[in-house]
Amino acid sequence: LIQSVSKAVQYMAKRRIGALIVFEKETGLQDYIETGIPMDSKISQELLTNVFIPNTPLHDGAMIIQGTKIAAAASYLPLSD
């Protein structure tokens, strides 16, 4: 899991591709997951990278990871104060 995410982030950083990835911990994120596109997908470097390629349908918004799966992509998160 960590290796796939790390490799994807390094790949995107070199190409200046932005990505917002959120890992669910103690605070549930179900309300935010429901604002995005459900994925329920295994995590891979290729999938993470492909989601955030500019001008693709899922690249806007956040990817939310629950446990060892991608729960949703293109999710809306609240703005900070």
Regions found by a protein language model. Name each.
Residues 1-81:
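Divalent-cation
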